[in-house]
Amino acid sequence: MRKRVLIVDDHQPFRAVARELLESAGYVVTSEAADAAEALAAVAADSPDAVLLDVQLPDRDGFAVATALAAADGPAVVLISSREADDYGRRVAACGARGFIPKSKLSAATFGALLE
C-alpha cells in the first residue's frame, strides 16, 4: 500500500517541489498545509500515514506540532528545515519525530528510510 503524506511548509514553492518528489516516488500526497493550524486540521480530516513538517511555521514551531501529534498517537513525522541538523539535535528526538532532513538534502529515499 502506498503511504499517504501531508506536506507542511509555509512556502508554497517548496511544497510544490516536495509534492513532485514524493509523488514521483509513489507516495500519495493527501494535502498540503501552510501553518500548524492547517496541519492539525488536515491530519484530523485526511488521516495521513506520515507528515513532512517544516520546523519553522508562522503560527507554531514544528517541534510543538510533532509533540502534539505524537501525544495523540498520530502519523509518523519527519521534520525539515533550511537549517542543518546540528542546530536541532536533541529537540528532534524529544518531540517524537522519526528524524530530520535538511531541505537541501530532501529525497524520497531518505524520507522513506526514516519511515521504516
Q: Where do the protein language model's features map onto the residues?
A:
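Two-component/phosphorelay signaling modules centered on CheY-like receiver
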Residues: 12-31
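The feature encodes the CheY-like receiver
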Residues: 58
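Acidic catalytic/metal-coordinating carboxylates
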Residues: 35, 61-64
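A short, hydrophobic beta-strand element within the central beta-sheet of small alpha/beta folds
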Residues: 74-86
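Alpha4 helix (beta4-alpha4-beta5 surface) of REC/receiver domains from two-component response regulators
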Residues: 64, 83-101, 105-113
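Acidic, metal-coordinating helix/loop segments flanking the phosphotransfer/catalytic sites
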Residues: 32-50
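Active-site residues of response regulator receiver
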Residues: 9, 54, 81
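Short amphipathic alpha-helix used as the core "switch/output" element in two-component signaling
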Residues: 63-74
